[in-house]
Each structure stands twice: as C-alpha cells, then as structure tokens.
Amino acid sequence: MPPFFDFLMSAGIAFFVFIISAIILPGFFIWIGLKVVGKERDVLRCGMANFAAVVITAVVAFILHFTPLVLLLPLLAFLIYLYVLKTLLDVGFIEAFAATIIAGVVIFLLAVILLLIFGVWLLFTPPPAQMMHVKF
C-alpha cells in the first residue's frame, strides 16, 4: 500500500466540509431571504450564486484596492456583490438587497440564540475541580 492511500478519502471529507461551509450554509440563508421576499430558488443555486458573487467581488475589490477609493470601496464592493447576485439569481436589485439583509438578520438572530443557550449552559455548569497542591 502506498503511504498516501486514503488521500482521496481525506480530500473527499475536506471537499464536503468546504461545500457545506462555503456554499450550502450561505445558500440556505440567502434562500430564506428570497423565500421571505417571495422568490423560489434552490438552496444550491443560491449558494453557488453567493459564492460566485463573493469571489468576483473579492477580485474586483483587490484590483480597486490600489486606487484612491479606500473610503468608497466597501460600498462599491457591496454594490458589485448585489449586482452579481441579482444577475445569477434572476431577481431584481431591491429583492437581492432585501434577501441579503434578511439573511444577515437571520444569521444575527441565530448567533444571539446560540449565545444565549451557551451562556445559560456555562452559567449553570459547575466549575472544574481544583487541582490540589499545584502552584503555577
């Protein structure tokens, strides 16, 4: 057996983790935003459109980083992101904006709920036992 025999298996696991973390989860939140707006799109299509929009925006922002548009670059990058997202998802500009805002609110509320759950869990978890006769 070669030493890197299960390289494909480990690359497969890394690939699936990448797909889930970079495409499926953001696509799910964009899908929720589009569902609230009233548009029907697949989660995978939303995820791929979001991933492509982020990559294109990063490339354009990298190029514009060398210009004196430092103060306007975040707004310009967000507008480029919205334009690419609306083009790939076949929705209007306002609908793409609303979907991203709704997705951001959903992510924020999910983070608050998880923080509350883990905060209560940490509040009522007993502290670890003290190590006796140990000096640091």
Swiss-Prot record:
It is a multi-pass membrane protein. Its main location: membrane. The chain crosses the membrane at residues 10-32, 44-66, 70-89, 102-124. Keywords: Cell membrane, Membrane, Transmembrane, Transmembrane helix. It comes from the Archaea. GO terms for cellular component: plasma membrane. It is found in: Cell membrane. This is Uncharacterized protein AF_1013. It comes from Archaeoglobus fulgidus (strain ATCC 49558 / DSM 4304 / JCM 9628 / NBRC 100126 / VC-16).
